[in-house]
A protein has these predicted regions:
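Residue-level signal for inorganic ion chemistry
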Residues: 43, 99, 120, 163, ...
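Conserved core of the sugar-phosphate nucleotidyltransferase
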Residues: 123-255, 277, 351-352
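Residues that recognize and position ribonucleotide moieties
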Residues: 115, 211, 289
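Short coil/turn connectors at secondary-structure junctions
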Residues: 6-8, 56-57, 79-80, 109-112, ...
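A short acidic, often aromatic-flanked loop/helix-cap motif at beta-alpha or helix-coil junctions
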Residues: 89-94, 155-157, 192-194, 286-288
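Conserved N-terminal catalytic core of the sugar/cofactor nucleotidyltransferase
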Residues: 1-12, 20-30, 35-134, 151, ...
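Left-handed beta-helix
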Residues: 1-7, 215-374
């Protein structure tokens, strides 16, 4: 990194379950640990995007303890003490907080910068992405700054949250490449009609879940807006590096508030300019959150209506299907717009437009205690 910014660390959030990618995504091998798009896993791709920016000693991963061994196998370059395990999932505020207190204690990193990044997103323009990450870290080095990357919308999407830039900000000029804009507000996932208005206004961006700030700035705001979680994390911090750490983590972590960093900190901070400065940098990086099998189809299809297959498959008089068949031969005849995914013990068949509902299958399996399929 440039000498103009403090030491910077990448925090990869890799603790999700990926239930919408059942039956391939399971508790011990969730979406981020699978090669769903490309030959390498989502986690490996994320790590490789970051290595030109951060040395291995400055990359951290937060994951569930059941996934820690698989993470270690995939990222052998990352020091084992940098793979932070959650005893139970408590959403992104807790996960980021755990990383922050480890930086504070292990690296004496109160002034260090954190780049918080999901493990399971697709980015089609990695060079531009790295340039924007550098700009975001530079902006985050300013006192009190909380910086978010926003994706310029390419369609009226109802599945993402939106970020509205402040009205007084002028449209970005070529000389202002990668500039940070003040945020007016964070908007919930909208209706289709409202999403169309957002896109037409030119002021709204998709919230991509990528965040940048100083450790000290984050912890100050966490104490202000989520004081109980902050206090519990500081109790955990006191035990880092001691024989009592595991017990403290187990005891305290399950009591942390189960809330996203957006709701917990960023949204209230954007309404509180007296205490915080919240900014967004537009990032046209060919991004997808790869949120369902339908998103995988969109990324892999070479043209509208094409069939996409991984593994051994045949499509006859068929169109728009995604077939994932790593072991069995699958033939699809006279069908359209389906997702077909087989594993050794399960088969999923659903329409592409209902791919978001695959998570309901996992809920049903949980209710019926079919643990072998989870």
């Amino acid at each position: 990194m440039s000498s103009a910014v403090p030491p910077s660390h990448a925090i990869i959030l890799a603790g999700g379950r990926g239930t919408r990618f059942w039956p391939r995504s399971r508790t011990r091998s969730p979406k981020q640990l699978l090669n769903i798009v490309g030959q390498k896993t989502m986690l490996e791709q994320t790590y490789e995007r970051l290595t030109p920016l951060f040395p291995g000693s400055h990359i951290w991963v937060v994951t569930h303890r059941e996934q820690a061994r698989a993470v270690s196998r995939q990222l052998r370059q990352v020091p084992s003490r940098h793979i932070l395990t959650e005893p139970v999932g408590r959403n992104t505020a807790a996960a980021i907080g755990l990383a922050a207190v480890h930086l504070l204690k292990q690296e004496r990193g109160q002034d260090a910068l954190m780049a918080v990044l999901p493990a399971d997103h697709f980015i089609g323009k990695p060079a531009r992405y790295r340039r924007i990450v550098r700009a975001a870290l530079k902006a985050a080095a300013q006192p009190g700054a909380l910086v978010v990357l926003g994706i310029p919308p390419t369609r009226p999407e109802t599945g993402y949250g939106y970020i509205e830039r402040a009205r007084h900000d002028k449209p970005r000029q070529s000389a202002d490449r990668d500039r940070a804009y003040a945020i007016r507000r964070f908007a919930e996932k909208p209706s289709l009609e409202l999403a169309r208005k957002y896109v037409a206004s030119g002021r709204y961006l998709w919230n991509a879940g990528m965040f940048f700030w100083r450790v000290s700035t984050f912890l100050e705001n966490l104490e202000r807006y989520l004081p109980k979680t902050h206090a519990a994390l500081m109790r955990i911090a006191e035990r880092i590096g001691t024989s009592r750490y595991a017990a403290a983590l187990q005891r305290e972590y399950s009591h942390l508030e189960n809330i996203s960093i957006d709701y917990a900190l960023l949204e209230p901070a954007s309404r509180d300019p007296k205490h915080a400065r919240v900014f967004v940098i537009p990032a046209a990086i060919d991004w997808s959150d790869v949120g369902s099998w339908a998103a995988v189809y969109e990324l892999l299809a070479k043209r509208p209506g094409a069939n996409v297959s991984t593994g051994r498959a045949l499509a006859l008089d068929a169109a728009g299907n995604l077939i994932s068949s790593p072991s069995k031969f699958v033939a699809a005849v006279g069908v359209s717009n389906l997702v077909i995914v087989e594993t050794s013990d399960a088969l999923l068949v659903c329409s592409r437009e209902r791919a978001q509902d695959v998570g309901r299958v996992v809920k049903w399996l949980e209710q019926h205690r079919l643990q072998k399929l989870l």
